[in-house]
């Protein structure tokens, strides 16, 4: 009986290889959607709120308002969204800490 090879990568077929450029083939990127700077460019505020709400976001309206604020530049929007995320995380920690102390007291 022959032992099986210890390196299965050598017996891999050409159809399972990751890079098509080995054989001179190229990925077809012409049909891909072009990247945009603002991913929320073609969406209205209500649809964005619905998207956030459906994903379980408790502050969907506030988050959508931050994104659609016209007077803020990109850095201000990023800071506002990060602050909103931090406040949510802080409230969670406060809740967990309060729960921990209430269990010890009783």
Curated annotation (Swiss-Prot):
A Pfam family the protein falls into: TC1
GO molecular function, one term: Notch binding
Keywords of this entry: Apoptosis, Cytoplasm, Nucleus
Keyword DNA damage among record annotations: no
Keyword Nucleus attached: yes
InterPro entries: Avpi1/C8orf4_dom, Tcim
Any one GO cellular component localisation term in the record: plasma membrane
Quaternary structure note: Monomer. Interacts with NOTCH2 (via ANK repeats), the interaction inhibits the nuclear translocation of NOTCH2 N2ICD. Interacts (C-terminus) with CBY1 (C-terminus), TCIM competes with CTNNB1 for the interaction with CBY1.
Role according to the record: Seems to be involved in the regulation of cell growth an differentiation, may play different and opposite roles depending on the tissue or cell type. May enhance the WNT-CTNNB1 pathway by relieving antagonistic activity of CBY1. Enhances the proliferation of follicular dendritic cells. Plays a role in the mitogen-activated MAPK2/3 signaling pathway, positively regulates G1-to-S-phase transition of the cell cycle. In endothelial cells, enhances key inflammatory mediators and inflammatory response through the modulation of NF-kappaB transcriptional regulatory activity.
Protein name per UniProt: Transcriptional and immune response regulator
Species of the source: Bos taurus (Bovine)
Encoding gene, per UniProt annotation: TCIM
């Amino acid at each position: 009986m022959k032992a099986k090879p210890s390196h299965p990568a050598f017996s891999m077929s050409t159809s399972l290889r990751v890079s098509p450029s080995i054989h001179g083939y190229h990925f077809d990127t012409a049909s891909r959607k072009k990247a945009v700077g603002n991913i929320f460019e073609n969406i209205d505020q209500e649809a964005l709120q619905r998207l956030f709400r459906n994903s379980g976001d408790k502050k969907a309206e506030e988050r959508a308002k931050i994104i659609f604020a016209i007077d803020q530049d990109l850095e201000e929007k990023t800071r506002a969204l990060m602050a909103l995320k931090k406040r949510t995380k802080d409230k969670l920690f406060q809740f967990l800490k309060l729960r921990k102390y209430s269990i010890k007291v009783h």
